[in-house]
A protein has these predicted regions:
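Membrane-interface segments at the starts/ends of alpha-helical transmembrane spans
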Residues: 26-30
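Short, flexible active-site loop motifs that bind/organize anionic cofactors or intermediates
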Residues: 25, 70, 111
Length: 177
């Protein structure tokens, strides 16, 4: 299965020993920043899943003469879209706090709130994309698919931040030996 394959790759190919944490990084902000970041990504993952379910349900509902499926047990597309939006409303302030907590921690550790580290830049890109989604959904009347596609792009940025930036970029967030 894909999960077992990824776990196997993580253990054999992608694994690196973590180096000793620099003394300047030992702070209460480590626990706060990492915990809130992890929780906010979990909430964004739920929102992403709901967005995918919405797109599938919307397609099924617009298909004439479709056969019954397990999707009939889920709410209608409009309800799924509203739920997707509601979960993003919870996730976005958490991500905002993640970025702010990281900036406070960076100021303590390196003397600057912002250092143009690849992880910082992608965290800001994520924030901008989700802000655009929430703004478009709330004020410009973008409903349904148009808005959900922006949210899905935001989750794509999260994947880039954790899968690409962590593996291929070196910066202040690179702590492996």
């Amino acid at each position: 299965t894909p999960v077992l394959l990824n776990l196997g790759l993580a253990i054999t190919v992608w694994y690196t020993d973590a180096s000793e944490l620099m003394p300047s990084l030992r702070s209460v902000w480590l626990a706060i920043h990492v915990a809130v970041a992890t929780f906010s990504v979990a909430v964004f993952t739920i929102a992403f899943s709901l967005g995918i379910l919405y797109l599938v349900q919307d397609r099924l509902e617009s298909t004439p003469g479709r056969k019954r499926s397990f999707m009939d047990r889920l709410p209608d597309a409009r309800s799924l879209e509203r739920l997707t939006y509601a979960v993003h409303i919870v996730a976005f302030p958490l991500w905002t706090f993640t970025v702010i907590a990281g900036a406070i921690w960076a100021r303590q550790a390196w003397g600057s709130y912002w250092n143009w580290d690849p992880k910082e830049v992608w965290s800001f890109v994520i924030w901008v994309v989700y802000a655009a989604y929430l703004h478009a959904r709330a004020t410009t009347g973008w409903k349904r698919q148009n808005a959900v596609w922006i949210a899905l792009a935001g989750y794509g940025c999260i994947i880039i931040n954790f899968a690409v930036v962590n593996v291929f970029f070196v910066g202040q967030h690179s702590y492996s030996g």
